[in-house]
Design a protein with these regions (language model features):
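Conserved alpha/beta-hydrolase catalytic His-Asp/Glu region
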Residues: 124-126, 140-196
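Active-site loop/oxyanion-hole signature of alpha/beta-hydrolase fold enzymes
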Residues: 39, 48-90, 248-251
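Conserved HGGG/HGGXW glycine-rich cap/lid loop of the alpha/beta-hydrolase fold
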Residues: 7-59
Length: 268
C-alpha cells in the first residue's frame, strides 16, 4: 500500500473493453470532473477516474505525503480495477503533476500522457497561497476555488455552478489537512530529468484563458516529442468547458500513436 495514505483510493469506471485510460483530477475538484470524457471515451476504452487522497470519497492522507505516494496510490487503484494492465494517463492541473510521477514509477506500463491545466512553474508560488486558503477556510474554500479553474465566461454559466455545487456537496467526505499535505508534496523539488526522461507519447491540451497557459509552452519544450493543442477561450479545466474539442484532440492523439481501437470510427 502507498505510504501516507489511509487506505485504497475511491474510483469509478466506465467501459468494459479496450485499453485502459486513467483520469486524475485537479484541485479542488474530484473524479467527476472527467464525466464528459468518461462518457465518450468508454466507447473505445476502459476508463477509470480516481479521487486522490482527501478529495471526493477517497481516504485521508497523513503528514509527510509525497507525490510518489499519491502516484503509487493511483496505480494501486488501477491495479484493483484492471489487474496487470498498462494505462494511458490523463491529468488536469494537480493530476497533470501526478501523472509524470506515475510514469516514473511504471514507465513500462504507461502508454501515453494527456495533460491539461498545466505548465512549467518550478517556484510553485501558487501552492503557498492555496495552503493558506485551506488553513483559513477549510474545505468550504473548494466552492469558490472551483470557479478559479474556469474561464471568466464559463464562471457565470449554470453548468459552471452545477460543477461547483457538485464538488462542494461532497465536502463531508473531503479533508482540508489532506489537501494541504498534497500541496506540500507538490512543493517538494523534482529530479532534474523529471520531464526530460519521459519517453511515452505526451500531449498538452491547454486553455487559452488558463492562468498557466503561457507556462505550458515551457513544459512542452521540457518533454521530448511533446505535442500541444490550444483550446481557444477555455480555462484551466478545459476538459469541462470544451469537452467536444478536448475529446476530439485526445482521440486524434491516441489514434496517431496506435492506441485507438479500430472500430467504431469517432465522429471527428
Amino acid at each position: 500500500m502507498a505510504e501516507h495514505v489511509e487506505g485504497p483510493l475511491y474510483y469509478e469506471t466506465m467501459g468494459r473493453t479496450g485499453p485502459v485510460v486513467a483520469f486524475v483530477h485537479p484541485n479542488p475538484m474530484d473524479q467527476s470532473c472527467w464525466m464528459f470524457q468518461m462518457a465518450q471515451l468508454s466507447t473505445w476504452f476502459r476508463c477509470i477516474a480516481i479521487d486522490i487522497p482527501g478529495y471526493g470519497r477517497s481516504p485521508k492522507a497523513t503528514k509527510g505525503l509525497t507525490m510518489r505516494d499519491i502516484a503509487q496510490a493511483c496505480w494501486e487503484a488501477i491495479d484493483d480495477a484492471f489487474p496487470g494492465e498498462s494505462a494511458i494517463l490523463a491529468g488536469c492541473s494537480t493530476g497533470s503533476a501526478i501523472a509524470p510521477h506515475m510514469y516514473h514509477l511504471r514507465p513500462d506500463k504507461t502508454k501515453a500522457l494527456v495533460l491539461c491545466g498545466t505548465g512549467y512553474n518550478p517556484r510553485k508560488e501558487f501552492a503557498h497561497h492555496r495552503i493558506k486558503s485551506y488553513q483559513d477556510r477549510g474545505v468550504d474554500f473548494r466552492w469558490d476555488y472551483t470557479f478559479q479553474d474556469f474561464s471568466p465566461a464559463f464562471r457565470t454559466t449554470p453548468l459552471g455552478h452545477y460543477f461547483a455545487n457538485l464538488f462542494a456537496e461532497r465536502n463531508v467526505y473531503a479533508d482540508a489537512d489532506s489537501i494541504i499535505y498534497q500541496f506540500e508534496a507538490l512543493l517538494q523539488p523534482e529530479a532534474a530529468d523529471h520531464h526530460s526522461a519521459i519517453k511515452a507519447p505526451t500531449i498538452i491540451l491547454s486553455g487559452s484563458e488558463d492562468g498557466a497557459h503561457q507556462s505550458a509552452f515551457a513544459l512542452k519544450d521540457r518533454i521530448p516529442g511533446c505535442e500541444m493543442r490550444v483550446l481557444g477561450g477555455a480555462g484551466h479545466a478545459c476538459q469541462i468547458e470544451q469537452p467536444g474539442l478536448f475529446n476530439r484532440w485526445m482521440l486524434e492523439f491516441l489514434g496517431k500513436h496506435g492506441l485507438m481501437p479500430a472500430s467504431p470510427k469517432p465522429m471527428m
